Swiss-Prot record:
EC number: 7.2.2.6
Oligomeric and partner information: The system is composed of three essential subunits: KdpA, KdpB and KdpC.
SUPFAM superfamilies: Calcium ATPase, transduction domain A (SSF81653), Calcium ATPase, transmembrane domain M (SSF81665), HAD-like (SSF56784)
Family named by the database record: Belongs to the cation transport ATPase (P-type) (TC 3.A.3) family. Type IA subfamily.
Primary site of residence: membrane
Protein name stated in the entry: Potassium-transporting ATPase ATP-binding subunit
Gene name of this polypeptide: kdpB
Annotated PANTHER family: POTASSIUM-TRANSPORTING ATPASE ATP-BINDING SUBUNIT
Function statement: Part of the high-affinity ATP-driven potassium transport (or Kdp) system, which catalyzes the hydrolysis of ATP coupled with the electrogenic transport of potassium into the cytoplasm. This subunit is responsible for energy coupling to the transport system and for the release of the potassium ions to the cytoplasm.
Annotated positions binding ATP: 361, 365, 393-400, 412
An annotated Gene Ontology molecular function: magnesium ion binding
InterPro entries: ATPase_P-typ_cyto_dom_N (IPR023299), ATPase_P-typ_P_site (IPR018303), ATPase_P-typ_TM_dom_sf (IPR023298), ATPase_P-typ_transduc_dom_A_sf (IPR008250), HAD-like_sf (IPR036412), HAD_sf (IPR023214), P-type_ATPase_bsu_IA (IPR006391), P_typ_ATPase (IPR001757)
UniProt-annotated binding residues for Mg(2+): 535, 539
Organism: Bacillus cereus (strain AH820)
Topology within the bilayer: Multi-pass membrane protein
Length: 697
């Protein structure tokens, strides 16, 4: 009897395995396509008009041209063999190609994301409601702002808009990747809809909020393709420093022959070019653009749309995070927290009747009561409740429960409503009911009274529960030197209780939306950078004021327009991950800059002795690596300089490992790993390459 079941299960497992294997194959195929495209682009980017945007690599390209010409038209006074010039020119060419490949690879990943987004932009038609009430079908490309459109079940939402009538379930998987549909309704903070999403139930009327080319998907495509990417202030500053270093070393190398002629010897042009390329920070110069693009790419993979690289960088410098209590720190729905018996009743009795009243209750509160009772190992008769008649909650009665087959009536609900119901049954009210109800209210909870016929057994303490792991996450932020401030409309006592439980640094009680702006400005006046999340129209001013404003995709258009980041999953806690990505971006750029500059130390000890030993024998003392010959030393330094770029591409794309700790601790750690490592690795690498090159010279 068991054999068919086993075979069926095996087949199911095999089909699942095949599906996973297909996904892996598709991912590998996409990666291969991206790499092939990047290789083609690395050659196309050799165009001087493109290269001049990266001054460091442009200098290397000019060096390639000079040495390539010298390969065919060598100087008459040159003592360098002809093969040396062509070898140097090829190494310089590949140095530029590797740098171009890094940038093209990062851009290619963005283009792949853009292509998948473009697939969601299908040719759809919209049912436009004219002023006279007539419904006309037009192409989505002909829609304009303020047009009114009716979207029915199974139809694609033609463009961005806001629901002005009706309620519907909308499948946003094309945008967010989340398969579960979300409810969109007129009014409130969940009225915003996005073009390219599908209505899966009911019917809604929306007003269009964007013209063609200005929709949410259009902006996403533009951003991930890099069309709207601008260099950030930090990136510009670093690029300026690196360009200045390049200019200084260029002046040094150009004027060097004057001094060598005075000393009675000449240095070949190819050697001078090699010296310049080894001195300038080519490693970080070749990876700088890729790091910035990859940082935007990492944010996008978290389903967060950053309006600019500046926003991602700002997230890395954040000092203070403003967080709403409801939905961010807490679940936002009330859950059973404690059972409080009254009079002479026991917790077991309260739990038993609370569970029976909730067996048929499908609300989140009802489910949480069952889970709480089961966690307390309190027994109850589930079948007894299932055989009874469920009494749903109504605004008029403010109670729910079940009428059992034997005539017993079980109720749970608001304190006043249940007390009146018990009195109508001829029952008496225990003295401590109101006392315990007041205690729950003062704690910020919601009291529900549990009664059976004319007898009150106790209360259920419903609490907006703090999300698991929040204390640990706030501790990580504290280690990073980031202060957390919780804003809530609760009274100070309740706010203090939740703040203590969650582990936030500060809280603002009885906070109104306009108070958030004051909190943000107060922090900014102290020189702090502030991040906050929001989804409502009333959050828009604060989102605009914050240095990093993360709006929820489920929120209003006003909130999304005010923010500089949008979370497609509408998860407010994701601001913590965004801060981590921002810090990782800054750390990656800083670490690779440190590594690149530290590399120069080893290159000095390789190329300087090689250049001057013949004329100044005392310079041999600097040849601490005992390199084979001057020509081998120069080629080894150049080869290492070229090869290190592709080796560091995965690190630039993925970002360096990030652990929450203070800025000083991070600085010390990165100086040790990438500063000291940047000195040691080239010594080893150049020596190994020299041994190999020495076999051929």
């Amino acid at each position: 009897m068991m054999r068919p079941v086993v075979v069926k299960e095996k087949r199911v497992n095999e089909s699942h395995i095949h599906a996973v294997e297909d996904e892996v194959r598709q991912a590998k195929t996409m990666d291969r396509d991206i790499v092939k495209h990047a290789m083609k682009q690395s050659v196309a980017k050799l165009n001087p008009k493109v290269m001049i945007k990266n001054p460091i690599m442009f200098v290397v390209e000019i060096g390639f041209v000079i040495t390539f010409i010298l390969s065919f038209f060598p100087s008459h006074s040159s003592s360098i063999p002809g093969w040396f010039n062509i070898t140097v020119s090829l190494i310089l060419l590949f140095t530029v190609l590797f740098a171009n490949f890094a940038e093209a690879l990062a851009e290619g990943r963005g283009k792949a994301q853009a292509d998948s987004l473009k697939q969601s932009k299908k040719d759809v038609f919209a049912n436009v409601v004219k002023e006279n009430g007539e419904i006309v079908q037009v192409s989505a490309t002909d829609l304009r702002k303020d047009d009114v459109v009716i979207v029915k079940q199974g139809e694609m939402i033609p463009s961005d808009g806001e629901v002005i009538k009706g309620l519907a379930s909308v499948d946003e998987s094309a945008i967010t990747g989340e398969s579960a549909p979300v409810i969109k309704e007129a009014g409130g903070d969940f009225c915003s809809v996005t073009g390219g999403t599908m209505v899966v139930s009911d019917e809604i009327t929306i007003v269009i909020t964007s013209n063609p080319g200005e929709s949410f998907i259009d902006k996403m495509i533009s951003l991930v393709e890099g069309a709207a990417r601008q260099k950030t202030p930090n990136e510009i500053a670093l690029n300026t420093v690196l360009t200045s270093l390049t200019l200084i070393f260029l002046i040094v190398v150009v004027t060097l022959p004057i001094f060598t002629n005075y000393l009675g010897f000449q240095i070949d042009t190819a050697v001078l070019v090699a010296l310049l390329v080894c001195l300038i920070p080519t490693t970080i110069g070749g990876l700088l653009s890729a790091i910035g693009i990859a940082g935007m790419d990492r944010v996008t993979k978290f389903n967060v749309l950053a309006m600019s690289g500046k926003a991602v960088e700002a997230a890395g410098d954040i000092n203070t995070i403003i967080l709403d209590k409801t939905g961010t720190i807490t679940f936002g729905n009330r859950m059973a927290h404690t059972l409080l018996p009254v009079g002479n009743e026991t917790i077991e009795q309260v739990g038993k009747w609370a569970a029976i009243s909730s067996v048929l209750d499908e609300t989140p509160e009802g489910r949480s009561v069952i889970e709480h009772v089961q966690a307390k190992s309190i027994s109850y008769n589930k079948e007894l409740a299932e055989q009874g008649e469920f009494i749903p909650f109504k605004a008029e009665t403010r109670m729910s429960g079940v009428d059992l087959q034997d005539g017993t009536k079980v109720r749970k609900g608001a304190v006043g409503s249940v007390i009146e119901w018990v009195k109508s049954q001829g029952g008496t009210i225990p003295k401590d009911v109101n006392q315990k109800a007041d205690f729950i209210s003062k704690e910020g909870g919601t009291p529900l009274v549990v009664a059976v016929d004319n007898r009150i057994y106790g209360l259920i303490y419903l609490k907006d529960t703090v999300k698991p792991g929040m204390r640990e996450r706030f501790e990580q932020l504290r280690q990073m030197g980031i202060k957390t401030v919780m804003c809530t409309g609760d009274n100070p006592l309740t706010a203090a209780t939740i703040a203590k439980e969650a582990g936030v640094d500060e809280f603002v009680a009885e906070c109104k939306p306009e108070d958030k702006i004051a909190v943000i400005k107060a922090e900014q006046d102290k020189g702090k950078l502030v991040a906050m999340t929001g989804d409502g129209t009333n959050d828009a001013p604060a989102l605009a004021q914050a240095d990093v404003g993360l709006a929820m995709n489920s929120g209003t258009t006003a909130a999304k327009e005010a923010a500089n980041m949008i979370d497609l999953d509408s998860n407010p806690t994701k601001i913590i991950e965004v801060v981590g990505i921002g810090k990782q971006l800054l750390m990656t750029r800083g670490a690779l800059t440190t590594f690149s500059i530290a590399n120069d130390i080893a290159k000095y000890f390789a190329i300087i002795p090689a250049m001057f030993t013949l004329a100044i024998p005392q310079m041999e003392a600097l040849n601490i690596m005992k390199l084979t010959s001057p020509l081998s030393a120069i080629l080894s330094a150049l080869l290492f300089n070229a090869v290190i770029i592709p080796l560091l591409i995965p690190l630039a794309m993925k970002g360096i490992a990030y652990k929450p700790m203070s800025s000083n601790a991070l600085l010390g750690r990165n100086l040790l790993i990438y500063g000291l490592g940047g000195v040691i690795v080239p010594f080893i690498g150049i020596k190994v390459i020299d041994i190999i090159v020495g076999l051929f010279i």
